[in-house]
Amino acid sequence: MDSARPATSLTHPDEPAFRAWLRALSHAFDHDFEGDLGSPGGRAFLLATFTDNGAVPAPYFAPLVDEHRRVHAERVVAALLTRARRDTGRVFDVPVRHEWSDAPDGIGRVFVGHEPVEGLDPVSMAVAAAEGVQCHLADRELLVWPLCPDHRTGPHATRTPDGAAWVCSVTHHVVAPVPS
């Protein structure tokens, strides 16, 4: 599923069958999937999934969400660990793991370190993955990374109007983007 393709090749978000599918998924998972249309990344995932697979029932949709979250988390972690190696000269390993849902046919959970990666939007997933990397390095390596170059403090991964970013905890300026 390629969510980076032109929007013109995707199902229109007001298509009645698409909206009915979202309502069915929302009921099955007790989650407002129509609310996920408010984020560009969530909308792209849902439209691409419907376009590519049709109105798949909940048990077949759940693994698609699991894979979507895992792939995004792994990409962000790989990019951040490359950056951490460049900044520190050290090689780190931060686990990305998936746990199956306790509910039959439910959506599983993805974790970076101990941080859950939830939602459908790549920016939100990038923020959670970055927090997971940062906490894991602090807990396991006793390392504050990344550092704000102006204040030598650890910034916080935050959603900004421009996407995921490391934001200084002292003056709230953007230190660096977080890949998403």
PLM regions and their residue ranges:
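General detector of N-terminal leader/presequence modules that precede the first folded domain
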Residues: 1-88
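Intrinsic-disorder/low-complexity coil detector
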Residues: 5, 12-15, 56, 94, ...
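Histidine (H) residue identity feature
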Residues: 12, 27, 31, 68, ...
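Charged, alpha-helical interface segments at or near domain boundaries
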Residues: 49-129, 133-140
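Cys/His-clustered metal-coordination modules, chiefly Zn-binding fingers
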Residues: 111-180
